[in-house]
Amino acid sequence: MVTRKPAVAGMFYEASKDGLINQIKWSIEHELGPKSTMNVKENRQYVLSVIVPHAGYVYSGPVAAHAYVEVGKYIKPKVFVIIGPNHYGVGSPAAIMTSGTWETPLGQVEIDEEVAKQIKAKVKDLAEDPIAFEREHSIEVQVPFIQYLFPGSRIVPIVLWNQTIDLSRRLGSAISEVIDGRAGEVVVVASSDLNHYEPHEVTTDKDMKVIERILNMDEEGFYTVMDKYDVSVCGFGAIMTAIVYSRKQGSTGVKLLKHATSGDTSGYLLETVGYASIAFYK
């Protein structure tokens, strides 16, 4: 069995178990965090997918916490399908792991083999390629939040450096077909930061342009606006996949839970990265 060892523990998040738990709690209770508990509401609504940032926890942790706390208000998922960009271009253009475990300072989380293999069978672009995940942080930084808030749940990791609209549509449709009838048990996580390395006001303005298209569940419009205004979204393929998946599942609403930039947490406003947590509901 393959165990994917942590690559960014001690850099993007605390390397010790106690330190990491405290950092997750800090993210939740931070002035930019959700500050709320996850008492499951007694209604039939649930979260289909979320868009979550993936920077170091000291920068984006409070924004990321909004997404996971929101999920926990409605459901306790059994599986998280986590899709992120391949920042390093290592390995296959589209990669998945269909077996094994992922390790963090909080322990190991299992890959859901059934769901992963069914998705891979429907999307021929996806290669079984653990090498593509070895250095990549976009999936890894999501895992501790899932382990801490949803113990016992499993994951399906997917990374893309092929981020075309075509692949995103096919992947979103395939996940919908695999999950059909089980949406309340599965959440799709699109791991992405928004605009990069521009002043706080510029980043905020650019982010809001693409967020508007996301809230309209318009993947093509999102891509067009991103290109037109040079918004340097790193995980745009993951975001488009979540939009398509949610629409295929009959999403009845989308909500911007929180937006901030690294300047809001660090105080340095000259070169910032944008972060948003967004939830799609049914």
UniProtKB/Swiss-Prot annotation:
The record ties this protein, via InterPro entries, to:
MEMO1_fam
Q: Which family does it belong to?
A: Belongs to the MEMO1 family.
Query: What's the protein here called?
Result: MEMO1 family protein Cmaq_1590
Q: Which organism is it from?
A: Caldivirga maquilingensis (strain ATCC 700844 / DSM 13496 / JCM 10307 / IC-167)
